């Protein structure tokens, strides 16, 4: 039996997508078109990218012009003329994706629109109408769970034509077999030079959307034996100033960490916090749970809404609510963080690159 042939159109080769395409390519013939040139991805450290194992055919499209910093690649059309068992367009807002969908509609070639996540917002009617027009260009959709399905349906997708998959950046081997014992956590904290008895971890860029200003205000009310460590590149002057104004001697900013070093910070922690103002998914939630950590995040984080069960493996708090975040952190730290971590591990086990590839293979190969 011949392999199924799949074509994907996406922005750039992020590490988890490279791993996913490699895994999917073990049982199918996968071609991936990238429309954003790597030199334009300035918000990512060069060490963040990974090379493919050769499991798929990657093609960098040629940028014809940039539309509001988005790439328009007219050469995408020539690749859409070839025969595939399934075509998947990731997202719907880039000029290249819109061009591809319009061409496929015109030629009556079936395809899927894939959306990693989405949050329904209050917005002007014209913006809602435009999004609806774009979403409904597709005849079928792929999403990451209930909340993404609700998002797509809000913009006109037919619920019965939305399929879901386990979204992840992790391979099966990346998920711990069991939670890290407290004795090992203490030894790691000592080795890392962490003086506080309890360590809270946050990871993300120092940008307003991540909500680290909210975390700093919440950390002010925590006990002094709790250290909050934020990993995400160089802290901006605004965050340095806020830390000083609040007198937060137990809040620490760490630069970019490679995978092995970051693993030690995860394992040394007892709680993970993502106080985001908005994340259409938030893969860092998957990663924290894979290290056996309870998670606190906001009601504007789709990964949290899908994966965190309030009071079981973490808490969901209202966005930008300092008091609620402080209360949730204090409650989690005073409780059984190991039990929360164990619940996170069990919840996250199906969310792997291998399962994600298996889901796609089954859905696209019908």
Q: What kind of region is each of these model predictions?
A:
Residues 95, 109-127, 137-140, 144, ...:
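A short, histidine- and acid-enriched strand-loop-helix "catalytic/donor-clamping" loop
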Residues 277:
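Aromatic "clamp/platform" in nucleotide-sugar-dependent glycosyltransferases that forms part
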Residues 239-257:
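Nucleotide-activated donor-binding/catalytic signature segment of Leloir-type glycosyltransferases, i.e.
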Residues 309-311, 315-322, 330-336:
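Conserved acidic donor-binding segment of nucleotide-sugar-dependent glycosyltransferases
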Residues 294-298:
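Short hydrophobic beta-strand element within catalytic cores of glycosyltransferases
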Residues 256-257, 264-269:
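Short alpha-helical donor nucleotide-sugar binding micro-motif in glycosyltransferases
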Residues 19, 198-221, 238:
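A conserved mid-protein helix/loop that constitutes part of the nucleotide-sugar donor-binding site
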Residues 136-186, 194:
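Donor nucleotide-sugar binding/catalytic pocket of nucleotide-sugar-dependent glycosyltransferases
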